[in-house]
Amino acid sequence: MITSKDRSIVRELAKQVRDRAELPIMEARRALWYQHNDLKTTRPIIATFPEVAWHEIIPPESLQCENEEFRFMETILRGKLFRADVIRDDVPIERTWEVTKIITDDGFVKDGKGHASVANNPDYRDNCLGGINYLWLHSYKFNPNAGHFDPIIKEYEDLDLIKTPEVTYHEKESMEKLAIHQDALGDILDVQFRGQKWLYFAMMETYTNLRGLQEVMEEIYEEPEMLEDGMERFAQAYHELLDQYVKYDLLDLNNDQSYSGSGGLNYTHDLPKYPGGAKDTRNFWGFCESQEFTMVGPEQHWQFVMKHEAKMAERFGLFSYGCCEPADKKLKYILTIPGIRRISVSPWADVEVCAEQIKDKAVYSWKPMPSTFINSFDAMEPLVRRMLEATKKHGCCPEIVLKDTGTCNNDPASYGRFTELCRRLIEEYYG
């Protein structure tokens, strides 16, 4: 049931978001992102994504709406206002309000077998092509306890369980959702109906979730043929999964405020490149990462995983690579990925080595250590300085992406202090 109270709450919040979006600073931030992603400026850009810590910023008990769909709207709207008023980073507030088509699939394993979550979370369902919200919702539940893991793929013949997910578009439910959002917000914000925009291909993560991380590491030496075969099958399945999204017109162009790779935004004038719009994946950003291969050498990383990721990248106009895995020892391969435009420089990567090799060939997407931000804020300044010195010396196009903060120690204002720190240092180094 939708009450007048719920409707009044989200409409008032939407008006505040609209007002923030129309501020001149937001247009300046959009222009900065376009220059940044098009590799036309070396001035660092700042983007913060609190992720799990959104639970502390907007606690579920603080929400005023009662209807579940309106609680979703309220959460997103309050998140946008928090970004504009407290974080104050370079992420612009847009007047657009996207309603995403409801799309599901039946997974990569025959007979419906599979783990809903290796994190032992019954409320989490992995979208096989990837999906990301503006913020982590109040309804997400995470069990911090360890859970027993029983691999589905135990023997070589179990690879025959792998299949291509079959996609289903729930049009009726999607249109009903669109109508609710349009009715509530359509005269205030620009409500847009959108398909999949964040295109994420987690080949090794998918295999590891079914095989087990220790088992995969052992396979490298004991059964490399099995690992090669398994990755060939998952690569083919991901290609066929993407084909379905194209065939059923379930994609929407992502050269806008869409989340990019493992952090950042997709604003660019370099896309779209070809006629056909969303029917041609060459007009999109794509994204791959292989965190599970962090401790594996560059040659084997290429042999077992990255060659498949590079093949996937051929289908896209621009590509992001990496997440938490350190890139410094693998850049000779990463830089050969077709269309590479954003490279994750994780907290464990050597910032100097990465700066020397990346230069202005791609966006240098630096992720400061979130545990330092959480536990020792005063230690953040030397980390930021070290990155700024390295990237300025080598003429990089850097961005500072604070993410993976599992908590903010119930101090939401700390995100604003981090932005202030970064702005002060950027001004010192760049003027």
For the regions a language model picked out, list residue spans one by one:
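Active-site loop segments of alpha/beta catalytic cores
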Residues: 1-51, 57-73, 79-83, 90-93, ...
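A generic structural signal for solvent-exposed, polar alpha-helical segments
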Residues: 39, 103, 114, 140-142, ...
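N-terminal accessory alpha/beta regions
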Residues: 85, 92-118
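Compositionally biased, low-complexity repeat tracts
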Residues: 110, 126-127, 143, 208
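Polar low-complexity intrinsically disordered regions enriched in Ser/Thr and small residues
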Residues: 115-117, 133-134, 264-267
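Aromatic-residue-lined binding/catalytic grooves and analogous aromatic/hydrophobic interfacial grooves
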Residues: 119-129, 134-136
